[in-house]
Amino acid sequence: MPDTFFQPVSGFELPRFAGIATFMRLPHVGLLDKRLNDVQIGLIGTPWDGGTTNRPGPRHGPRQLRDYSTMIRAENGATGVRPFELVNCADLGDVGPNPADLHDTMARITDFYQKVK
C-alpha cells in the first residue's frame, strides 16, 4: 500500500489551477522535514541564470516547471502505470542561489545536495 502522503493532490480535491504549485502537485518536503528520509525521488529546483550568457531567464525555470507540471496525471494513459504508487516522490524546494557570486552559488548547491543525501 503506497504512502498517501507522497501522492499528488487529486484534481477532484483541489483544481489544478489552485493551491501552491509544487512539482507534479507532490508534497513539499523541506530539508528539515521529518519525512525527508522517506523520500525516494526528490525534485530540486536551481533558479539561476549564471550558467548562460545572452539568455536571461533560466532562473524562472523551476517555478514554471512546477506550474506546468500541475497537468501531470497520476496514471499514464498509455501504459496504465501509476508511478507515484511505486516510489515516494516529493518536491524538495529550491536551492537559494547568490546571483552576484558564482562561487557562493556553487557552494550553496553543493551544500543543499549534501544535506539531501
Predicted regions and their residues:
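Metal-dependent C-N hydrolase catalytic cores
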Residues: P2-K117
